[in-house]
């Protein structure tokens, strides 16, 4: 039996270290995978498994809005991945108020103002009836505009408020937009009628034409027409703005693209294969030499 000499032991240990050094870069290359968040460079010759979590970049593969993102195809020499539902810990998206909700809140305020304008029209129209027996000629009152105009203003304002409370109802939203446009047209008609009232009755407010009592009725009628003219101008602006906001919300409902959040992928455990020529241990070499 041949006993190992000191020189042979040195040669064996040297060959062992050289083989380990040549295997070490190969093991590091097998451990690193593209897109991983960490790299394990343990030089243990035995098989080991490590779970690798990869996050797909947003531009790594195309995503069509409104469709389920497909799993990207990886080469056969790389581990296949599967989707994990949810978000990474600590990466919860910030909860922000959508623009459509902010627009609807503005529409609710404008709708409340429209209701008040409609009530003012009905109230001042009732006061104008008391001046029918004077020399004041209310053309707008003969057409009944303070009443039917005020009713339409109240209806359009109520629909604007209801659209904010039920933002997912397309019927309320479309009805609010349509009635706001109609209210804007009605307020434009009312502006022309009240301007006509003021222009006709303004020549009768001087004391030389009628006694004081009749002149007071004309002054009261002109003052009421002036106030209603101001409210009609306000209603025209509010109805136009409400229609604009309603169209914006309708566009947000019909053309709302889906928000694409990058998915989290988990690769299958990577098993480091053993080298084709495993490193012999010192005891095995000694036994073989014997």
UniProtKB/Swiss-Prot annotation:
Region (Disordered): 1-25
Stretches assigned to the Cytoplasmic side: 1-108, 160-174, 242-290
Chain intervals with Polar residues compositional bias: 1-21
Its membrane topology: Multi-pass membrane protein
Membrane-traversing stretches: 109-129, 139-159, 175-195, 221-241
Tissue expression remark: Expressed strongly in intestine and colon and minimally in lung and ovary.
Keyword list, A-Z: Membrane, Receptor, Transmembrane, Transmembrane helix
Similarity comment text for this entry: Belongs to the MS4A family.
Name the record gives this protein: Membrane-spanning 4-domains subfamily A member 8
Organism lineage: Eukaryota, Metazoa, Chordata, Craniata, Vertebrata
Encoding gene per record: Ms4a8
């Amino acid at each position: 039996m041949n006993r190992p000499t000191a020189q042979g032991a040195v040669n064996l240990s040297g060959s062992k270290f050289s083989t380990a050094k040549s295997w070490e870069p190969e093991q590091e290359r097998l451990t690193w995978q593209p897109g991983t968040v960490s790299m394990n460079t343990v030089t243990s010759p035995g098989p080991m498994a490590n779970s690798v979590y990869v996050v797909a970049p947003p531009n790594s593969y195309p995503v069509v809005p409104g469709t389920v993102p497909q799993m990207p195809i990886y080469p056969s020499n790389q581990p296949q991945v599967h989707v994990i539902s949810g978000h990474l810990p600590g990466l919860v998206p910030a909860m922000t108020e959508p623009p459509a909700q902010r627009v609807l809140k503005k529409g609710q305020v404008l709708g409340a103002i429209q209701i008040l304008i409609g009530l003012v029209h009905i109230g001042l129209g009732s006061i104008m009836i008391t001046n029918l027996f004077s020399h004041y000629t209310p053309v707008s009152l003969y057409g009944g505009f303070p009443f039917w105009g005020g009713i339409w203003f109240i209806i359009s304002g109520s629909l604007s408020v209801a659209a904010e409370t039920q933002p997912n109802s397309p019927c309320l939203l479309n009805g609010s937009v349509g009635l706001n446009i109609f209210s804007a047209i009605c307020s434009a008609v009312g502006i022309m009628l009240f301007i006509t009232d003021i222009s006709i009755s303004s020549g009768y407010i001087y004391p030389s034409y009628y006694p004081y009592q009749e002149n007071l009725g004309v002054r009261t009628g002109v003052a009421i027409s002036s106030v209603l003219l101001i409210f009609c101008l306000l209603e025209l602006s509010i109805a136009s703005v409400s229609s604009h906001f309603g169209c914006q919300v309708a566009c947000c409902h019909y053309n709302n693209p889906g928000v694409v959040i990058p998915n989290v992928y988990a690769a299958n455990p990577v098993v480091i294969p053993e080298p084709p020529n495993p490193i012999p241990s010192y005891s095995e070499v000694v036994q073989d030499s014997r």
